[in-house]
From Swiss-Prot:
One of its GO terms (cellular component) is photosystem II reaction center. This is Photosystem II reaction center protein L. Keywords: Chloroplast, Membrane, Photosynthesis, Photosystem II, Plastid, Reaction center, Thylakoid, Transmembrane, Transmembrane helix. The chain crosses the membrane at residues 17-37. InterPro entries: PSII_PsbL, PSII_PsbL_sf. HAMAP family: PSII_PsbL. Its main location: plastid. It is found in: Plastid, Chloroplast thylakoid membrane.
Length: 38
């Protein structure tokens, strides 16, 4: 019953989606701040 591959793939998928979400929030924060300060 020890199969680390599917769990590892799920963790990597969640990690990459988390990184894309943080990158998207970071870009939106930069655009929003530049829109306010201009």
């Amino acid at each position: 019953m020890t199969e680390p591959n599917p769990n590892k793939q799920e963790v990597e998928l969640n990690r990459t989606s988390l990184y894309w979400g943080l990158l998207l929030i970071f870009v939106l924060a930069i655009l929003f701040s530049s829109y306010i300060f201009n």
